[in-house]
């Protein structure tokens, strides 16, 4: 619920101040809702990242047609997500312009790209997996 200035540079241990735009409980509730998107039955199960809980949103839009209105066969597909959902370290948006083939929905087209890229980014950043926390059960682990 806090907006912080974006940067590509790591500033050591310097604390970056932001401004609160959502109260903490509302932000937590929205993140919890967005985790359902990548769980079984959600619209972006292919965006899931092994051993991490992901929160995200899919998007699919028709592109504007040259002759006016919207094209029936040209789309933009996207998936925007963050991980780990309970304490986000990384946020990412994957957009695919005019996906080819029969699938054009964000969860099916951009979701797998998000999954692979986020998985590598979390590994490179040494973000501890959720699976190592004893009180967290991931959808991929099933019920014990």
Sequence positions of predicted segments:
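Conserved active-site-proximal loop/helix segments of enzymes involved in bacterial cell-wall
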Residues: 1-51, 101-104, 124-144
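Generic beta-strand/beta-sheet core signal
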Residues: 6-7, 55, 59, 83, ...
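Short alpha-helix boundary/capping segments
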Residues: 22, 72, 102-113
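Extracytoplasmic/secreted envelope proteins and their assembly/folding machinery
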Residues: 27-34, 77, 111, 115-119
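Residue-level preference for non-acidic, small/hydrophobic
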Residues: 30, 57-59, 80, 92, ...
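Solvent-exposed loop/turn segments at secondary-structure junctions
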Residues: 37, 60-62, 85-87, 97-101
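Short, Gly/Ser/Thr-enriched beta-strand-loop segments that form substrate-interacting elements
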Residues: 50-83
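Short, well-ordered beta-strand elements
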Residues: 79-80, 88-104
């Amino acid at each position: 619920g806090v907006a912080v200035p974006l940067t590509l540079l790591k500033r050591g241990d310097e604390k970056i101040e932001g401004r609160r735009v959502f109260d903490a409980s509302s932000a937590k509730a929205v993140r919890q809702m967005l985790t359902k998107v990548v769980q079984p039955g959600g619209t972006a199960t292919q965006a899931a990242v092994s051993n991490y809980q992901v929160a995200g949103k899919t998007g699919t839009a028709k592109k504007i047609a040259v002759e006016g209105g919207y094209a029936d066969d040209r789309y933009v597909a996207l998936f925007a997500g963050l991980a780990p959902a309970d304490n986000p370290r990384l946020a990412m948006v994957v957009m695919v312009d005019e996906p080819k083939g029969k699938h054009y929905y964000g969860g099916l087209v951009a979701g797998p790209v998000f999954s692979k890229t986020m998985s590598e980014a979390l590994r490179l950043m040494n973000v501890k997996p959720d699976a190592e926390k004893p009180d967290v059960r991931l959808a991929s682990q099933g019920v014990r």
